[in-house]
Amino acid sequence: VSVDCSEYPKPGCTMEYRPVCGSDNITYGNKCNFCNAVVKSNGTLTLSHFGKC
């Protein structure tokens, strides 16, 4: 399972709720929020699965 975060970081994310679970066991509201966190983590954060943790 993976997400393409090559277009990130983005300055703002929509409020669309399509949760993804990160390897840090945090539920991110959508791909944009998750990808911004991936960039901030220098790539150490990965996708655990789609849906809530």
Curated annotation (Swiss-Prot):
Location(s), subcellular: Secreted
Annotated site (Reactive bond 3): 15-16
Entry GO terms, CC: extracellular region
Keyword Electron transport part of the UniProt annotation: no
Residues annotated as glycosylated: 42
Domain Kazal-like: 3-53
Disulphide bridges, residue numbers: 5-35, 13-32, 21-53
UniProt-listed PROSITE patterns: KAZAL_1, KAZAL_2
Keyword vocabulary terms for this entry: Disulfide bond, Glycoprotein, Protease inhibitor, Repeat, Secreted, Serine protease inhibitor
InterPro entries to which the protein is assigned, alphabetical: Bifunctional_prot_inhibitor, Kazal_dom, Kazal_dom_sf, Prot_inh_Kazal-m
Molecular-function annotations in GO: serine-type endopeptidase inhibitor activity
Entries under Pfam families matching the protein: Kazal_1
Chief subcellular location: secreted
PANTHER family, sorted: OVOMUCOID-LIKE-RELATED, SERINE PEPTIDASE INHIBITOR, KAZAL TYPE 2, TANDEM DUPLICATE 1-RELATED
Domain remarks in the Swiss-Prot or TrEMBL record: Avian ovomucoid consists of three homologous, tandem Kazal family inhibitory domains.
Name of protein: Ovomucoid
Biological classification of the source: Eukaryota, Metazoa, Chordata, Craniata, Vertebrata
